């Protein structure tokens, strides 16, 4: 039973992450579809970086925030590092494409 003022900690649960081909090719052995344990987008990035060191630097800048040319979507909505993830969430990481 929770006491007044106490918060219950949520245990990380599996979320499904879909990575773009432009990012996956930089990490030999990386999959486009991966399951990681996370309760937020920041924890998801940590999980990806644990699997493939250097992934965090490709997704996030030094502030830290998601890089300008990377978009993360959860349930069809653009997400930030602080966005919470429900168990079984489907997360899409998308790179911006530009050209002239």
Go through each PLM region and give its residues.
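Ubiquitin-like/PB1-type beta-grasp interaction modules and other compact soluble beta-rich domains
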Residues: 1-99
């Amino acid at each position: 039973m929770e006491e007044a003022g106490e918060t219950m900690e949520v245990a990380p649960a599996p979320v499904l992450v879909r990575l773009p081909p432009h990012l996956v090719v930089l990490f030999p052995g990386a999959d486009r579809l991966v399951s990681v344990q996370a309760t937020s987008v920041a924890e998801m990035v940590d999980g990806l970086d644990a699997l493939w060191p250097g992934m965090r630097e490709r997704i996030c800048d030094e502030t830290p925030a998601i890089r300008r040319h990377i978009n993360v979507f959860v349930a069809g909505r653009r997400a930030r590092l602080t966005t919470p993830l429900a168990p079984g969430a489907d997360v899409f990481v998308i790179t911006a494409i530009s050209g002239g």
